[in-house]
Design a protein with these regions (language model features):
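Helix-loop "lid/cap" segments that line or gate small-molecule binding pockets
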Residues: 294-295, 346
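Structural motif
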Residues: 272-291, 297-301, 331-338
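Long, low-complexity segments enriched in small/aliphatic residues
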Residues: 317-353
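Short, solvent-exposed helix-helix connector turns and helix-capping sites enriched
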Residues: 243, 312-320
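Short helix-capping/linker segments at secondary-structure and domain boundaries
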Residues: 296-311, 350-356, 463
Length: 507
């Protein structure tokens, strides 16, 4: 009895508060029991007595008894991904952090369990279904009408209340509900923008932050994404031209890419990568550009692009379509498009027309960023013309000097958030920023063992000085996957065992 009293007195109040704020639960894909909670937040922060929105979160308790009081929060990307849906994939990467720290997954308003603003998931649709800009805009208009009638929304204008600034106020409400004085943030892609906004709003509550694939608040995604995607594609083409093995197998790769674009649109047939059924459809530049952009995120998939582009130029489209599907099919890859547009139309939309170049790409303009800019720019320009836009404070676009240590991670081959974005964010953050670039990595570095170790040592360091001084030389050893080479036939059969050897094996 006395031991129980002493033990109870030893437990910090924050842990007791965390237990009271959550209840045991299960998350699909996570083997063990976790704890789930919810905070009730006003839909419109200016009307605290108005309709409320439930912000759901999951806490994965630390393994060790002597836990540390500063949990690690994951901020998902997209914008529009569910952090809770990513838990099964992320927890193995956070295993060392989870030894002594709770890991917290918060579904940002508009995602996952927190009033998901989801449109129809078209990722696995039939190849014959229209996939062009006109079809996508029509689908988004229909989605807007449906979302406007979804509780707790009262009208389409309520989609204005899903901006990053409001979401980070929700996140701090979760922190307070758990009783944590300070927290660590790990943001990925758009999650880095969210982390920067949390740091701006609540610097005193932030202990450390890791930004994986830095997306600055003033980055205009449709424009920068087009430029950076083309740069990543050009780097892949140049790498193949410089590689004796790739050049020998694909001597006309750049010409194949240009001739493929120049031949579009055209009627084709191909086997669907998921169903295996042959479908007849019109292949256009929008579908090809989207199919190429996805694999560029992961160098292991991009290694298959030389073969896939060459095959497509010769009329066989299954390899290219299959590569695109490989990325789209990953766990947690679904994006709530309603939330996605509510964020980007409010935060990027006002700057889109200013930064979007004029002119068209032309069929063979593979050496300019125009094709990829046109692909995203047209869609966002037209969608944001009718999508409700929230209010964004001017201070949102300015990154202030960091009050705590911040680790910025970039992949040199990233088609979405390459190092150039982290460069200027690091300059703005000042002396408390540490930037690490992995030259041969793509979008999202946490899956690399060396980087996971860096992240753990950065967060676990006793003070900011030691955190900023971690040794990151291991990143130079990360290789770029060589271009995929198909098998040139079956390997030779193994020789049959002799009769005496067969008798011995039988015994």
């Amino acid at each position: 009895m006395a031991f129980a009293v002493v033990a109870a007195l030893w437990i910090p109040a924050s842990w007791a508060q965390s237990a009271e704020a959550t209840a045991p639960c299960r998350v699909p894909g996570v083997a063990h029991e976790v704890r789930c909670g919810v905070v009730h937040r006003p839909l419109d922060p200016a009307q605290p007595g108005g309709p409320a929105i439930d912000i759901h979160f999951v806490v994965v308790p630390a393994v060790a008894r002597r836990r540390l009081p500063d949990p690690v929060f994951l901020l998902a990307g997209g914008p529009g991904q569910s952090a809770i849906a990513l838990a099964p994939a992320v927890l193995p990467l956070f295993a060392r952090l989870n030894n002594r720290r709770d890991i917290v997954f918060v579904d940002q308003r508009g995602t996952g369990r927190s009033t998901p603003l989801e449109c129809d998931d078209r990722r696995h649709a039939s190849l014959s279904e229209p996939a062009g800009i006109d079809a996508q805009v029509a689908q988004l208009r229909a989605c807007l009408t449906r979302l406007a009638a979804t509780a707790p929304l009262r009208a389409a204008d309520d989609l204005r209340f899903f901006t990053t600034t409001i979401a980070m106020q929700d996140l701090d409400a979760v922190r307070a509900r758990l009783g944590a004085e300070r927290i660590n943030l790990v943001g990925a892609s758009y999650g880095t923008r969210a982390a920067l906004e949390y740091a701006r709003l609540f610097p005193q509550r932030l202990r450390r932050s890791v930004l994986d694939g830095v997306a600055p608040p003033d980055m205009v995604l449709p424009v920068s994404g087009g430029i950076d995607t083309q740069a990543a594609l050009d780097a892949m083409l140049v790498d193949c031209e410089r590689s004796p093995v790739c050049q020998r197998s694909h001597p006309m790769l750049r010409a194949d890419w240009q001739s493929l674009l120049a031949s579009l649109p055209k009627p084709v047939s191909a086997l669907h990568p998921l169903t295996g059924q042959r479908e007849h459809f019109t292949l256009d530049a929008e579908r090809v550009l989207a199919a190429v952009r996805g694999p560029l995120y992961a160098p292991s998939l991009a290694a298959g692009l030389p073969q896939a582009i060459g095959e497509a130029a010769r009329g066989r489209y299954e390899p290219l379509l299959g590569l695109a599907e490989a990325l789209a099919s990953r766990r947690g890859g679904t994006v709530a498009m309603g939330m996605h547009l509510s964020v980007l139309c409010a935060e990027d939309g006002p700057r889109l027309e200013r930064d979007l170049p004029t002119g068209s790409s032309g069929a063979g303009g593979a050496s300019t960023p125009a094709p990829f800019i046109d692909l995203a720019g047209q869609l966002y320009r037209r969608a944001c013309a009718f999508w409700p836009r929230g209010s964004v404070p001017e201070a949102f676009y300015v990154v202030p000097p960091a009050a705590s240590a911040t680790l910025l991670l970039s992949g040199g081959l990233d088609p979405a958030t390459p190092p150039r974005h982290a460069d200027r964010v690091a300059r703005a953050l000042g002396a408390q920023a540490r930037q690490v670039t992995v030259a041969n990595a793509g979008h999202g570095l946490m899956g690399i063992g060396c980087v996971r170790d860096l992240m753990f040592r950065f967060i676990d360091a006793a003070d900011d000085a030691h955190a900023l001084g971690i040794d990151a030389t291991c990143v130079a050893q990360v290789p770029r996957p060589p271009a995929f080479e198909p098998m040139k036939g079956l390997p030779p059969a193994l020789p049959k065992p002799s009769a005496s050897r067969a008798e011995e094996d039988a015994r």
